[in-house]
Amino acid sequence: KKNMTVVVDKNKIITIETGFSKAGNADRVIDLKTKTVMPGWIDMHVHLEFETSPKRQIEGFTYNPADYAYQSVQFSEVTLLAGFTTVRDLAGSGVNISLRNAINKGWIKGPRVYTAGKAISTTGGHIDPTNGYRKDLMGDPGPLDGVANGADECRQAVRQRYKDGSDLIKITATG
């Protein structure tokens, strides 16, 4: 529709009125007469800590958690500016929980984030951090790393995600 007024209070649409409403002295007016206004998009599967690139595998050896945290700030703002106002972040190093908290506190710009924190997988599953590495480089990942085998370890991993502040649980049962 054309010639409409959208009234927003504290980042929430309060009403949409026909015609151009007169603004009060304390109101901020953003003239969008030549623009199309639409609701924000929702992306149901993102990873705000990284992006797909040929360097992704080596970054696992050269980046520390702070590198992922700083990078995720940039990716969050880019995501918001692309029109996504809500995302479901389905696994990362755990930095994504702090990222969500920083956005919620207004410290950084980004979309509303619902995050799984770290995902959970079986040994050899999609999230097993030792996949593709020589045996002497593998280590022995467990529930804290996202690798859980059997009911007890799965319960432990889920409880840890809850304790860490995850909004949801992501389980990758296969490779």
Regions found by a protein language model. Give the residues of each.
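Metal-coordinating catalytic core of metallo-dependent amide/deamination hydrolases
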Residues: 107-175
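Histidine-rich, glycine-flanked metal-binding segment
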Residues: 1-38
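Metal-associated gating/positioning segment near the N- to mid-region
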Residues: 35-105, 123-127
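A generic local structural motif
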Residues: 17-18, 29, 73-77, 100-101, ...
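Short, structurally constrained coil/turn elements
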Residues: 23, 104-109
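Short, solvent-exposed loop/helix junctions and linker helices
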Residues: 1-2, 69, 148
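Divalent metal-coordination and catalytic microenvironments
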Residues: 6, 11, 34, 42-45, ...
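Active-site-proximal beta-strand/loop segments in catalytic clefts of secreted hydrolases
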Residues: 17, 32, 82, 90-91, ...
